[in-house]
């Protein structure tokens, strides 16, 4: 049930023929009978929407934003990966969860998906100081609680998304290769395959780098755009080789006829409005060294000089 809820919330299930116009991305709207981002309905016109541009110097330090605790991220499994018509989506097991990081509860992972472009500077949904990245990966988690399902669904923190910007790097990212290799088997919507065994840590930067992040309250970036998401946008990017990034737009299609490559599956930036963006103490800045740390080596040098 948790996985089904997450799929429905993210618009991963496609309508049957004859139903009302379905939502799509801007690149599709000019070629197909579908609703582009400016016509998305439901909660998509509200005031606490995502994604946003994060101005790093304006983000407020929140000392409660400490380290995350990752459970099950090291599990190596052969996972189901699907072309859902909007993105590539990897289903995650019930044993994967996060806590800490200023979150109000434990959150269980349901799936991960990505957004991208053929252009290496416009494939991410969020931007940092106006700069966008080649891709963005979202790991979606649902709040674990003893209350009723309706109460969870209606709360403004029922979903926690970990967002990772993806940049082009000089070397192949071997941890990502099982997913990249699987793309050839899911080129058209509705197809799925099983990836070679891998863990979530294979996809991510080192855990030590995940102390630096930004936090705000927002929405899903696809219809129904529910304003129920605790967003965490990490400062440290994932790095893939350019060829790995371009595999997503060359191997995947929006349509059964393979006429439109899947690319630019990115919602335009939304207004921040009266919301605040917070950052962990280290995000966007170098932490000053404590005074004793500076004094000890200085005094040692002075003493060494006197004893010569």
Swiss-Prot record:
Q: Which residue(s) hold a covalent lipid per the annotation (GPI-anchor amidated serine)?
A: 280
Q: Which residues are glycosylated?
A: 31, 192
Instruction: Please list the residues that bind Zn(2+).
Output: 113, 115, 138
Alphabetically list the UniProt keywords: Cell membrane, Disulfide bond, Glycoprotein, GPI-anchor, Lipoprotein, Lyase, Membrane, Metal-binding, Signal, Zinc
Q: What is its main location?
A: membrane
* Proregion span(s): 281-308
- Establish whether keyword Kinase is in the entry: no
* Regulation (activators, inhibitors): Inhibited by acetazolamide.
Q: What is its cofactor?
A: Zn(2+)
Please give the start and end residues of each transmembrane region. Answer: none
**This protein's name:** Carbonic anhydrase 4
Q: Provide the taxonomic classification.
A: Eukaryota, Metazoa, Chordata, Craniata, Vertebrata
